[in-house]
Amino acid sequence: MSSNLLRDAHRIVVKVGSSLVTNEGRGLDEAAIQEWSRQLAALVRGDESHGGQRREVIMVSSGAVAEGMKRLGWAARPKEIHELQAAAAVGQMGLIQMYESKLREQGMGSAQVLLTHADLADRERYLNARNTLLTLLELGIVPVINENDTVVNDEIKFGDNDTLGALVANLIEADALVILTDQRGLYSADPRSNPDARFIDVANAGDPALEEMAGGAGSSIGKGGMITKILAAKRAAGSGASTVIAWGREQDVLVRLAAGESIGTLLVAQTHKNQARKQWIADHLQLRGSVSVDAGAVAKLRDEGKSLLPIGMVNVDGEFARGDVIAVRDALGIEVARGLANYASAEARLLCRKSSVEIERLLGYSAGPEMVHRDNMVIAGH
């Protein structure tokens, strides 16, 4: 099961901790980042070493604070938030320069994306971040993501990049999250103090016993311990992404995982990603509004599984924002489907009975040809 899951994964989020990209906290490890870049490029290109399947890959990388400390000449990790933010600002320059350089050597384009909790809490910003990342992936670009440490405070921080990796996996509906660390994976107890500790090769990501098995804090270089990785896997499983926790120094670990080799601990999501999203839509009680559609649109939705296009819309009721859950109703007012609105209510009113090719002319921009995409829609009674 574990080998098939990673072998078949098309969209993958990879998270590497500080200890895997720095020289024991003393600045960036150029050779390590070069090696990560080589493996990332192999996955994106679809090298024969892992079956020739092209992947979409996002890298969530720590290391900015450690690099900033080196550039500033600081021997110990600062405790004051403003000093940490200063170190992150200085170090992020070096971190992204290193990835850009090493990925370019592999013939890969890269992009820097800095996120905050506010970006994912606000629905409009969430959708913008999602669409940007999906566009980058379609272009064959490797996004390198980190938290925007310079502008956040403790109340709105993700807390660690394990959590950020899980949230990014949810954001782009990844098939898998790979968390690379300085440990082999998960044990039933701390193997450093318990010789009877048993290695866990596969488990249900939602198993509450996993949190009891996980140990305490991580190293002084980074912030995450095993418990943050378990909680990240649980969060990622909510959108259908399974998680692998593995030793990042394992030779060709990403390429071998993609080839189907069982490495580390696999925490399996019990729900398929499409099922998870559609169940959330179906269970949504607070509908923000609705659109009425003609008989032709009803047939397209029910019988052919098509997306809802503006040309089939007759009327718009209520006030809703882009990304809100709305109902799709027939001429009698009966709910045919519900889904995520791709346009706000004011925009939707302008689009009624219009061809999708007119969207940009009417609105000044286009967020896609659909009012509700079929992947974001649940048909009533199905």
UniProtKB/Swiss-Prot annotation:
Keywords, A to Z, come to: Amino-acid biosynthesis, ATP-binding, Cytoplasm, Kinase, Nucleotide-binding, Proline biosynthesis, Transferase
Query: What pathway or pathways are given for this protein in its record?
Result: Amino-acid biosynthesis; L-proline biosynthesis; L-glutamate 5-semialdehyde from L-glutamate: step 1/2
Recorded hits in SUPFAM superfamilies, A to Z, give:
Carbamate kinase-like, PUA domain-like
Q: Name one Pfam family in it.
A: PUA
Q: For this UniProt entry, which residues form the secretion signal?
A: none
Q: Where does ATP bind?
A: K15, T181, D182
State which Enzyme Commission number(s) the record gives. Answer: 2.7.2.11
Subcellular location as annotated: Cytoplasm
The protein's annotated catalytic reaction(s) are: L-glutamate + ATP = L-glutamyl 5-phosphate + ADP
Question: Which SMART domains does the UniProt record give?
Answer: PUA
Domain annotation PUA: ranges: 288-366
GO BP annotations listed: L-proline biosynthetic process
Q: Which Gene Ontology MF annotations are present?
A: ATP binding; glutamate 5-kinase activity; RNA binding
InterPro entries given in the database record:
AceGlu_kinase-like_sf, Asp/Glu/Uridylate_kinase, G5K_ProB, Glu/AcGlu_kinase, Glu_5kinase, Glu_5kinase/COase_Synthase, Glutamate_5-kinase_CS, PUA
Return the broad EC class.
Answer: transferase
In which residues is substrate bound?
S62, D149, N161
GO (cellular component) term, any one: cytosol
Q: What does this protein do?
A: Catalyzes the transfer of a phosphate group to glutamate to form L-glutamate 5-phosphate.
Query: Which PANTHER family has this protein been placed in?
Result: GLUTAMATE 5-KINASE (PTHR43654), ISOPENTENYL PHOSPHATE KINASE (PTHR43654:SF1)
- HAMAP family (UniProt xref): ProB (MF_00456)
So what family is this one in?
Answer: Belongs to the glutamate 5-kinase family.
Q: What is this protein called?
A: Glutamate 5-kinase
Q: Which organism is it from?
A: Delftia acidovorans (strain DSM 14801 / SPH-1)
